[in-house]
From Swiss-Prot:
It comes from Geotalea daltonii (strain DSM 22248 / JCM 15807 / FRC-32) (Geobacter daltonii). This is DNA mismatch repair protein MutL. This protein is involved in the repair of mismatches in DNA. It is required for dam-dependent methyl-directed DNA mismatch repair. May act as a 'molecular matchmaker', a protein that promotes the formation of a stable complex between two or more DNA-binding proteins in an ATP-dependent manner without itself being part of a final effector complex. HAMAP family: DNA_mis_repair. GO terms for biological process: mismatch repair. One of its GO terms (cellular component) is mismatch repair complex. PROSITE patterns: DNA_MISMATCH_REPAIR_1 (PS00058). Keywords: DNA damage, DNA repair. Belongs to the DNA mismatch repair MutL/HexB family.
């Protein structure tokens, strides 16, 4: 017989509802801070301990609540923000469902202290697992203070899914960054385990972005102000060269609410399509303002997705707004193709690297035209012996493996095509070699060998470089600092969101190593419980290898080609680059003759 249908007890339904609203400590912070903003506060302070697992405390200077309202606030679907159907489609607040406080209280030890403006005393309510244990009067400043202790103490299954304290703190910092950017007129203070992570004072948007994302980045952002009827788009648009490997720095807001909407993101990427390489994401802060009746925010539990009444019009307006800034910006006028910007940056980086070489005498001087960094004798002798052998006759090598390993050295070089492909003859066949892919494979195998031995060889910088990271990136660095050191990046905290970069992988010296590091951090942020650093180690080494070699067209001398082929002969899997792309393609004489109908 089938199980009878029955009504679930309230305590169980509260936990089920909490699962939709409260996913991790950052979810709690989101709900509490949004309530504070809706209350008209001028300052929000967020304090956490153990990444929010032990304590989350949010204090605000908002309007506060009476004793009766405070008790009602812990009842499900009790809210002061909407009253009828019409209000649901003309929302002017971040919250409106009346689910946040009871959901949080049902999975924690919860304390709410509040005092309404003009009242002589406040009210303090203590609840445990959703049940109110104590209500009393208290003395406090006007506003509200909510403390959430021992999150998920009564739902151990959910507790198991939480990450390390550093990771959870990073998520909280990332969440607060989004909220603080949306309201530069409000002071935000964030502390973790008693240490102030950031203090964002009242400021304009650019200054707020500088505080949270870094002053260097803020200087590469251009203002945007676009109007199309009742649709307004304002904010800051980043240079294409500030791109990221993920959409973590695409901050989009609809009527003040942070969203991750596919329509909006597609419009932004379309605007950048001619200025940025595929697979990269820009840095933008966009505020989209439309009449409340033109957008539905009640389509997802987290309210990150929205539905526009005129989706096409919104998409086109956003794309046009961003494109208008990109078309008129100085870097586009002087260098209309982004590759030229990257090339000039590479030249400048190369010159800096050459000055460092001369000062430190770390490695023998090389010519500025040399593109293949792996051929420099700066690595330990053990690696030079296997990866960079001196030119020797093929006959001197061991006879058994020589047929396979000497393939590339045995090719007859015809020349280069488009300064990117090496044309060779092998008997009656034409062999076309992608020199960039070949360099990548050699560099990748060297990095793997170094990492397996004593770690990737690093190059200490003459002067440590200060780099500003987001709070989420900083949390990733702290969690994986040892592993990052083994792949060549030596970092130490310098205060706030600034870190000192002391050393970089040797193969990246002279290249944009900061961009490579940011890409690696983006990759590490995507790690789940089922994946570890070791699982993506080869992806990281492949990224370093890719960024270490010359991209695009570059003429190679006969000696450089010879050195490359010698290294290819001693490299495993030399037929493909680390990303799986082919290194060479062969056309037989018969195939060529068929092309010409012979």
């Amino acid at each position: 017989m089938a199980t009878r249908i029955k009504i679930l007890p309230e305590q169980l339904t509260n936990k089920i509802a909490a699962g939709e609203v409260v996913e991790r400590p950052a979810s709690v912070v989101k709900e509490l801070v949004e309530n504070a903003l809706d209350a008209g506060c001028s300052e929000v302070m967020v304090e956490i301990e153990a990444g929010g697992k032990r304590l989350i405390r949010v204090s605000d200077t908002g309007c506060g609540m009476t004793r009766e309202d405070a008790l009602l606030a812990l009842e499900r679907h009790a809210t002061s923000k909407i009253a009828n159907d019409e209000d649901l489609f003309s929302l002017a607040t971040l919250g409106f469902r009346g689910e946040a406080l009871p959901s949080v209280a049902s999975v924690s030890r919860f304390t709410l202290a509040t005092r309404e403006k003009g009242s002589l005393e406040g009210t303090e309510i203590y609840a445990e697992g959703g049940r109110i244990k104590e209500v009393k009067a208290c003395g406090m400043a006007e506003g509200t203070v909510i403390s959430v202790r021992n999150l998920f103490f009564n739902t151990p299954a959910r507790l198991k899914f939480m990450k390390s304290s550093e990771t959870e703190a990073g998520h909280v910092g990332d969440l607060l960054t989004r909220l603080a950017i949306s309201r530069p007129d409000i002071r935000f203070i964030y502390t973790n385990d008693g240490k102030t992570v950031f203090r964002a004072l009242n400021a304009d948007l650019r200054e707020r972005v500088a505080t949270l994302l870094g002053r260097t980045l803020s200087q590469d952002l251009y203002p945007l102000d676009f109007c199309d009827g009742q649709l307004n788009v304002t904010g800051l648009v980043g240079k294409p060269e500030c791109s990221r490997s993920a959409a973590s720095h695409v901050y989009t807001y609809i009527n003040g609410r942070f969203i991750r909407d596919k329509v909006v993101q597609h419009a932004v990427l379309q605007a950048y399509r001619n200025f940025m390489e595929r697979g990269r994401y820009p840095v933008v802060v966009l505020f989209i303002s439309v009449p409340a009746a033109e957008v539905d925010v009640n389509v997802h539990p987290t309210k990150h997705e929205v539905r526009f009444r005129e989706q096409g019009r919104v998409h086109d307006a956003i794309q046009e707004a961003v494109e208008s800034v990109l078309r008129s910006s100085p870097w586009v006028k002087t260098q209309p193709v982004v590759q030229k910007t990257q090339a000039s940056t590479s030249i400048a980086a190369a010159r800096i690297a050459q000055v460092r070489e001369s000062l430190t005498q770390y490695r023998p001087q090389k010519t500025t035209q040399q593109s293949f960094k792996m051929s420099t004798p700066a690595v330990p002798a053990s690696f030079r012996e296997t990866s960079l052998p001196d030119p020797v006759p093929v006959a001197d090598a061991a006879p058994a493996p020589e047929v396979e390993r000497g393939y590339f050295s045995g090719l007859s070089v015809i020349g280069q095509f488009n300064a990117a492909y090496i044309l060779c003859q092998d008997g009656n066949s034409l062999v076309i070699i992608d020199q960039h892919a070949a360099h990548e494979r050699v560099a990748f195998e060297r990095l793997k060998t170094q990492h397996a031995a004593m770690g990737v060889e690093s190059q200490r910088l003459l002067f440590p470089e200060t780099v500003e990271f987001s709070f989420k990136e900083g949390a990733v660095i702290r969690e994986h600092q040892t592993e990052l050191d083994r792949v060549g990046f030596s970092l130490e905290e310098f205060g706030g969101s600034t870190w000192l970069l002391n050393a970089v992988p040797h193969l990246l010296s002279g290249n944009d190593y900061v961009k490579t590091l940011r890409d690696i951090l983006e990759e590490l942020q995507s790690l789940g419980r089922s994946r570890s650093f070791q699982d993506i180690l080869e992806d990281i080494l492949a990224r370093i290898a890719c960024h270490s070699v010359v991209r695009g067209s570059h003429c190679l001398s006969q000696q450089e080609i010879k050195a490359l082929f010698q290294q290819m002969d001693t490299t495993e899997f030399s037929s493909n680059c680390p990303h799986g792309r082919p290194v060479l393609h062969t056309l037989t004489l018969a195939e060529i003759e068929r092309m010409f109908k012979r």
